[in-house]
């Protein structure tokens, strides 16, 4: 697609953490059947994501999330981008968070065959450049009914917000 017209994007994410966020999102979707994070704050020193879940994950599940994210990072998958029109979006890509005024052309970011989503942010070229993913803390906050999002038909209703704070150890020096 020549010279796609995209919405302005004012975020300059730290590439290793932003790619790790995509991997974490897909890991949470696969393990818990939830949507991608409700909100995300990506920074060089630490990043935070919140997920609406029916129950608080156990310590074992949290350790498994960390293990799976590192497994994807270590696989050194390519991170690629492609520009598509809305009618070319694959069915597995959710546009639920897309602003109403989003352009007709969207950029899809793929992390190997593990994840794909619409995104305008900066990324690494290969997952190993992220370094070692470490969950530094988690917290669980029960949600009151008026703050709950309506789940997809295949998802159990959320009862709380699960926050993950993560850091990256030894990311590539080129970022």
What do these predicted ranges mean?
Residues 1-175:
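Active-/binding-site microenvironments in catalytic and ligand-binding cores
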